[in-house]
Curated annotation (Swiss-Prot):
Gene: rdgC
Name of the featured protein: Recombination-associated protein RdgC
Keywords: Cytoplasm, DNA recombination
KW Glycosyltransferase (keyword) present: no
Organism from which the protein derives: Shigella flexneri
One term under GO cellular component: cytoplasm
Subcellular location: Cytoplasm, Nucleoid
Pfam families: RdgC
Source domain of life: Bacteria
Gene Ontology molecular function: double-stranded DNA binding
Annotated function: May be involved in recombination.
Family in the record: Belongs to the RdgC family.
Amino acid sequence: MLWFKNLMVYRLSREISLRAEEMEKQLASMAFTPCGSQDMAKMGWVPPMGSHSDALTHVANGQIVICARKEEKILPSPVIKQALEAKIAKLEAEQARKLKKTEKDSLKDEVLHSLLPRAFSRFSQTMMWLDTVNGLIMVDCASAKKAEDTLALLRKSLGSLPVVPLSMENPIELTLTEWVRSGSAAQGFQLLDEAELKSLLEDGGVIRAKKQDLTSEEITNHIEAGKVVTKLALDWQQRIQFVMCDDGSLKRLKFCDELRDQNEDIDREDFAQRFDADFILMTGELAALIQNLIEGLGGEAQR
């Protein structure tokens, strides 16, 4: 089981049908296919269990996990520039004249098409977890752009996907700032030794504290001077550590060894059973963490 490393959390803004049987067919229509000779990038669905299953969905306890795969052709700008300059120089020498800008632009497309078939590919995979019980969708990535790209693929596959980023009633950065100022987080959470503080003024600067006592006078002085906490490392019930960000995302998830070893009695050779058990364990813990976090941050924004 690929334990999630980050969480971008989204709320379904209205109820839609998310049944695995239907989704299996819908995702199949957008299954991953490799780039053709003239494709810059391709994205599609692959089995979350990899070579161990052909299914594009894996379901347990109302939780669904799916996996998007992306192939991108790598064409460094200097390579394109060098090939283009050589092509321009050759044509200008042959025709004994300087090429116009429109001609150079047209040549750039030609050069791009000639280089694409020989370009290397970069592959990446993004896991997505659909919590049909709580109406949430979680994407395992650190950037909003990557999450939005994956959601866009799912929206295209399903025909409709009404989601909004999970947001709180109170600004998250103000709640995090109060936790650091008071030296105490919400029930179930403990402050760790890492935070990022930003000034409310545009040119006020950023402070990144690592391996530091966040209740120290130095940190308090930054808060008194008008800085707010935009990232804060937290521990949840000594089970999961993570960095809470002011955009509502959870970064650098770290599950405690005791939690990760809970299914060690299952033979690792039985990949399907271990994957299923780890998925149930992980989603159960994260669902509880998210609910606890929503309460601790003052409740979800009313829609």
